[in-house]
Regions:
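Terminal-region recognition feature
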Residues: 1-163, 169, 181, 188, ...
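Short glycine-/acidic-enriched loop or helix-start segments at secondary-structure transitions
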Residues: 136, 174, 196-197
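Active-site-adjacent loop and "lid" segments of alpha/beta metabolic enzymes
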Residues: 138, 199-211
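Gly/Ser-rich catalytic serine loop of serine hydrolases
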Residues: 167-177
């Protein structure tokens, strides 16, 4: 048994098993950003209802329910602050808001976080968590994959670092776009990471899947991610990585062909 107070003091990591439970956006900011340095941006963006989607209730009603329950306007919160003294543009996805589904506002906020990093000439970090695209927005949701990827191409051209932090779960369109485009891709222990779910894959292929399939440990062994970082060490290790990436100098010398 673990008391709630003790669990919260340990950043929602169970002391015996090491299981990383979900963190709220507010707690995630407290974990990663220096006290008093956080400035939220784009907080007033809200989704429209372009498809007049009604399955399972109207989309505006669903949004209102999740906004009231979570205290968030959408599944992404972004802003900038200091991470161990290093200026950084940060976007955080919160699974408590409609499963952190990626809609037009989520994609716009991630894109603006990337563009803000270019403007401020600082690194960008995105903490990823998602169950997939937001079906209530149709193709506008899927469009965010290309939109965010294009923004990251501009960030790379500017020579600025980008780190993707994969938390439980990071699936579908988010995993197939900015979650796997980092200069360094890190994950929390035990995070579920993939495109389609294991059940769907098994039913489609008629094959048994290996133990630990789609976990961060499984994917680390196969090279999809670069590091697994315990939540307690996340801030210090991210800051170290960003400092190393920000000061990289690569010189390429021309080599004459011997042919």
């Amino acid at each position: 048994m673990v008391y709630t107070k003790d669990l919260e003091a340990n950043w929602n990591v169970f002391p015996v098993s090491g299981y990383h439970d979900r963190l709220t956006t507010k707690r995630r900011i407290a974990l990663l950003i220096d006290d008093g340095s956080w400035k939220e941006t784009d907080s007033k963006l809200v989704s429209k209802d372009p498809l007049k989607f009604t399955a399972g209730g109207s989309y505006p009603e669903r949004l209102a329910q999740h906004q009231k329950k979570s205290g968030l306007r959408d599944s992404v919160v972004c802003g900038h602050g200091l991470m161990d003294g290093l200026p950084v543009s940060l976007a955080i996805m919160d699974f408590s808001f409609m499963g952190a589904s990626m809609g037009s506002v989520a994609g716009e906020k991630v894109t603006r976080a990337i563009e803000r990093a270019i403007k401020l000439k600082c690194p960008c970090v995105v903490v990823c968590a998602s169950g997939g695209a937001r079906m209530q927005e149709g193709i506008l949701s899927l469009m965010q994959m290309a939109k965010t990827s294009a923004a990251l191409a501009k960030l790379r051209s500017a020579g600025l670092p980008y780190i993707a932090v994969l938390t439980n779960p990071t699936m579908a369109g988010v995993m197939a776009s900015y979650a796997t485009l980092g200069d360094v891709i890190v994950a929390e222990p035990g995070a579920l990471i993939g495109f389609a779910g294991a059940r769907v894959i098994k039913e489609t292929t008629n094959q048994d899947l290996p133990d630990g399939f789609q976990t961060s440990e499984f994917l680390l062994k196969r090279g999809l991610i670069d590091m697994i970082i315990h939540r307690k060490e996340m801030k210090s290790k991210l800051a170290s990585l960003l400092r190393a990436l920000a000061h990289r100098k690569v010189k390429v010398k021309a080599v004459k062909s011997r042919a």
